[in-house]
Design a protein with these regions (language model features):
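Catalytic Walker B motif of ABC-type/P-loop ATPase nucleotide-binding domains
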Residues: 148-152, 157
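The feature captures the beta-strand-to-loop junction immediately N-terminal to the Walker
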Residues: 35-37
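ABC-family P-loop ATPase nucleotide-binding domains
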Residues: 80-135
C-alpha cells in the first residue's frame, strides 16, 4: 500500500485551477523532491495532504486514510511560513508538542536546541528569523512521523543555514517514513533524493526515480530541471 495516494486530484480557487488531475503514488522509506516553479501547485498539494485545504474533486489517501484527525497524528508538517506564536516561550512550545503529539521526542528536540544554545525561557518574539526557522525545523523533525511534509524549507536562507537544514533532516527523520520536500532549489537537495516529481501548471510533468532520471538524461536533476522549465 502506498503511503500517500492522490487520485484525479483537482483544486480550484474560483476560476483558477491550482491542481489539475494529479495522480501520485508515494511509498515509504523515500525522500522525494516536489519541484516546480512558483505557482506550479507545490504548496497547494502539500496543504491538501495536510488537510489545510479540501480538494475540489478527486481523492487523497494517507496510509489508506482520508486526511483528518487520524492522519495528523502520523504526519509532521513544516509550512513555508512562520507558525510559532510570539507570546510563547521555547519551553512552552516543547510542552505543547509533547502533549499534542504522541510521537514527539522531547529529548531529541532538547538536544538539538542545546547545540544551538537556545534559551528555553526565551520568548519566540525575541528570536532572530533564522533561529525561529531552526526551532520550527527541530519541532517538526523531532517527531517519529510516518510522513514529513516540508514546504520550501530552503527558501530564503543562507548557505550555512541550508547545510544545517539538510543535515537536521537527514539525521532525524524516521527512516521507515516518507519525506516530501517541496523546492525550486534542486541543486541543494539533489544528493539526498530517492525520487523527484516535477509539477507544472498544476499537473504532474514527471515522477521518476532520481538515479534513473540522471542515467536517462545524462545530466544532473538540477540541470534537467533548468532545461525543462527554462530557468
Amino acid at each position: 500500500m502506498a503511503e500517500i495516494e492522490c487520485r484525479d486530484l483537482v483544486k480550484k480557487y474560483g476560476a483558477k485551477v491550482a491542481l489539475n488531475g494529479v495522480n501520485l503514488s508515494l511509498e515509504k522509506q523515500r525522500i522525494i523532491g516536489l519541484a516546480g516553479p512558483n505557482g506550479s501547485g507545490k504548496t497547494t498539494l502539500i496543504k491538501l495532504i495536510e488537510r489545510l485545504l479540501t480538494p475540489t474533486s478527486g481523492e487523497i489517501l494517507i496510509h489508506g486514510l482520508q486526511p483528518g484527525k487520524e492522519t495528523k497524528e502520523i504526519v509532521s508538517y513544516l509550512p513555508d511560513r512562520d507558525f510559532l506564536p510570539d507570546w510563547m516561550k521555547v519551553k512552552e512550545l516543547l510542552d505543547f508538542f509533547e502533549a499534542f503529539y504522541s510521537d514527539f521526542d522531547r529529548v531529541k528536540a532538547e538536544n538539538l536546541m542545546d547545540k544551538l544554545e537556545i534559551d528555553y525561557n526565551l520568548n519566540i518574539k525575541k528570536m532572530s528569523k533564522g533561529t525561529r526557522e531552526k526551532v520550527q525545523l527541530i519541532l517538526c523533525m523531532s517527531r517519529k512521523a510516518e510522513v514529513y511534509l516540508l514546504d520550501e524549507p530552503l527558501a530564503g536562507v543562507d548557505p550555512a543555514a541550508r547545510d544545517y537544514i539538510i543535515h537536521t533532516i537527514l539525521e532525524n527523520y524516521n527512516e521507515d517514513g516518507l519525506v516530501l520536500i517541496s523546492t525550486h532549489l534542486i541543486t541543494d537537495i539533489e544528493s539526498i533524493l530517492d525520487e523527484v516529481i516535477f509539477l507544472q501548471n498544476g499537473k504532474v510533468l514527471l515522477h521518476r526515480n532520481a538515479d534513473d532520471l540522471r542515467a536517462e538524461t545524462g545530466r544532473s536533476i538540477d540541470d534537467y530541471f533548468r532545461e525543462v522549465f527554462a530557468c
